[in-house]
Amino acid sequence: MKTKALLLITFIFSLITVNNKTMAQGYTFPELPYEYSALEPYIDAQTMEIHYTKHHRAYFDNFVKAATENKIDHLSLEDIFAKVSAFPAAIRNNGGGYYNHMLFWQVMGPNAGGQPDGALMDAINNTFGSFDRFKTEFENAAKTQFGSGWA
């Protein structure tokens, strides 16, 4: 199952363009695409503000610092993630946090949700057999995640 999940994550990464500037040299800290309160009552404005201004910002700043110190700040996030295991933990962890938060802001929008379509749905069906099976495996991954983390 881990192989299927990794393949799907790689495919999703290739489909989602959070911000063209972010996917190239010269990393940028993206603007939040909606108000902090947009996900209430599910996620309150204070939590969103803390995640955006503190957590995401720290991941971004620490990633840029690590990329500069390791002389890889000329590489795009896409290039870094293609060989992520070759880089130090500071790049892997902060780069992952930086990207995951950008992804979060996009997929957790006030009008997001439901079943995908197009190439993403095709990839889910090819990988898991059905959207329902994907949901079940995704929920199981989330339930069994140790400590803090994302499924």
Language model regions located:
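Feature for soluble, non-membrane regions of globular proteins
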Residues: 22-151
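Bacterial Sec-dependent N-terminal signal peptides
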Residues: 1-25
